[in-house]
């Protein structure tokens, strides 16, 4: 087992920075799939009112660690193994896909996540920077 399990109730409140085990199937092409941890990225107001969540998948396969959208984290937030958050794979999931709560990432880790989201969405690119 790679994470702790916490049973979710019907009145569960999702929070930004939370980790959940979610069923990412069905998928297409290069999208992350299967039952895997996801990190909630959406703001807490959206988490409360919307039936969906904005998430990033988490994997224990630490390939391409040097990408500006891959954040390697240690055994944190209920994860039992070093893992990598793939912030180029941000997607929307229905809350019903979340199977159980794993834990929450630290404020310091979420600050790093925020920087990588800016990279992923092109929010840090200056006018003179261009893609190859």
Locate the predicted segments by residue.
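Compact nucleic-acid interaction/catalytic patches
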Residues: 32-34, 40-75
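Hydrophobic alpha-helical segments that mediate membrane insertion or helix-helix packing
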Residues: 38-39, 113
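Short, charged beta-turn/beta-strand-edge "cap" motif at the junction between a beta-strand
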Residues: 25-29
